[in-house]
Amino acid sequence: MRRIMINASLCDGCKNCTVACMQAHRDTPGTVYDLDLTDIHNESRNHIEKMPDGSYRPIFCRHCDLPECVMSCMSGALSKDPETGIVSYDEKKCGSCFMCVMNCPYGVLKADTATHTKVVKCDFCMKDDAKPNCVKSCPKKAIYVEKTTDEAAKLFGINSNAVGYVVSDDEPDD
């Protein structure tokens, strides 16, 4: 299965991944040049944090093997696909209790700013059926998709059928 991998040492904090995510999920047609970055109805599903040492860390949903968000979701709005490993969100089922937000150990999930009635989370750009837009937009190739093998799963302590990311200092394979 595919995983979003992060080489944090290559990230320069440009936020192209954040803007690409917003562009991919916008409701109105247009280009990135007319994208309203302050539109609270179109929030990015990822963000970049600047660390005290000046380095940057891309923060993405890890689509965990044992996702706390799914286990704490009382309405069944969050589920993990056993085939792809992707944690999906069904807005129609969401009861807006935000237990998932409170239980995400990585602080990735958040309530939407506009209505405070739904959760904003990565969907791996499933509509595109290609590389996620954050990956396509990264000029430094700090974000990349990699097929996970059993060997990688053992090394990183992950399920080879999972989707998510691992902070890595290794160069991505092209």
Language model segments and positions:
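Conserved beta-strand segments that form the floor/walls of ligand-binding pockets within enzyme
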Residues: M5-I6, S88, K121
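A short local structural element in Rossmann-fold oxidoreductases
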Residues: M22, M74, P105
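Flanking helices and flexible, charged tails adjoining ferredoxin-like Fe-S electron-transfer domains
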Residues: D27-H63, P67-M71, E91-D174
